[in-house]
Amino acid sequence: MAGNSIGQLFRVTTFGESHGIALGCIVDGVPPNMALSEADIQPDLDRRKPGTSRYTTARREADEIQILSGVFEGKTTGTSIGLIIKNADQRSKDYGDIMDKFRPGHADYTYQQKYGIRDYRGGGRSSARETAMRVAAGAIAKKYLRERFGIEIRGYLSQIGEVKIDPQTVADVTKINWQQVADNPFFCPDKSAVEKFDELIRKLKKEGNSIGAKLTVVAENVPVGLGEPVFDRLDAELAHALMGINAVKAVEIGDGFDVVAQKGTEHRDEMTPAGFLSNHAGGILGGISNGQPIIATIALKPTSSITIPGRTVDINNKPVELITKGRHDPCVGIRAVPIAEAMVAIILLDHLLRFKAQCK
């Protein structure tokens, strides 16, 4: 299983399983002499961790980060930073019934077929629990980008099921009310949509069902020049990183799929001496950042861990009916906002370091 690392100069490698002893990661390429402590990382983990609201899984994990290496007297040394989070609230007994059954819509079947063995407890390595370490590494990247280059990376939830926010609240990404986003459990910039999200999630929890979501990440103050054509284009690398998040089924940069209905006269981002007149491209042209806000949107599927019976097969390919036990999110998109922010931060810092190494 070789796909556990991302990045070239800023490189993140994660390890651990949902019901294992701990989760961890190694972060390579962090420049030296940056002030860093657990307090710089913990806030983003608190935004992602389970059990923080009635809209997410009831599993309770403190997700307390511990720095093992790479920091001396409060500053990064330029060596590998080791991070670890101890698991505490596993209930592996909830998964005894699926030891020999494949949960439909999950990675159980494909992991078993590929490796001939799998950790069935909460999905093991395929669980979104692993993303806690991506958020931890991303927090380091966000801090460096913010302090050294003024780059801000923030995300918001725009849709749950059929309920959408008012598009006017995000029409100009430079004027999004980020305090409103921070002040509600849905990371929602539209105050009027919060109540509708609340009603929908409550209804789904009563039904034992789940729903999908859409969220957007905005990176502001990104300099011109990030991205390595042709195969390491910035948009391609962002799409790769974001598609690697559990449950993500689609990625859009800028206007994304809406470009199909646009004409060239509408889509082209015309320029004047004062700058661009629009940002349909989402801040990237020819695979290189153009200095405008980078806008990336992802769609997440509804989790298949629901209490409504469903048909599947066991390891002997015999038909069985399955009810998923355990504690699960009715909408995984809610807690995915800090995860998506982290992945964008990891890619941007990696490309910024690559840009500095080659161009300036």
Curated annotation (Swiss-Prot):
Which GO molecular function terms does the record list? chorismate synthase activity; FMN binding
| Any one Gene Ontology cellular component term annotated for this protein | cytosol
| PROSITE patterns recorded | CHORISMATE_SYNTHASE_1, CHORISMATE_SYNTHASE_2, CHORISMATE_SYNTHASE_3
Known partners and oligomeric status: Homotetramer.
Give the source species.
Actinobacillus succinogenes (strain ATCC 55618 / DSM 22257 / CCUG 43843 / 130Z)
Name this polypeptide is given: Chorismate synthase
What is the organism lineage in this UniProt record? Bacteria, Pseudomonadati, Pseudomonadota, Gammaproteobacteria, Pasteurellales
Q: Record-annotated residues binding FMN?
A: 125-127, 246-247, 286, 301-305, 327
The protein's matches in InterPro entries, at most eight in alphabetical order, are given as: Chorismate_synth, Chorismate_synth_AroC_sf, Chorismate_synthase_CS
Which biological pathway? Metabolic intermediate biosynthesis; chorismate biosynthesis; chorismate from D-erythrose 4-phosphate and phosphoenolpyruvate: step 7/7
Q: Which gene encodes it?
A: aroC
Cofactor mode of binding and number, as noted = Reduced FMN (FMNH(2)).
The record ties this protein, via SUPFAM superfamilies, to: Chorismate synthase, AroC
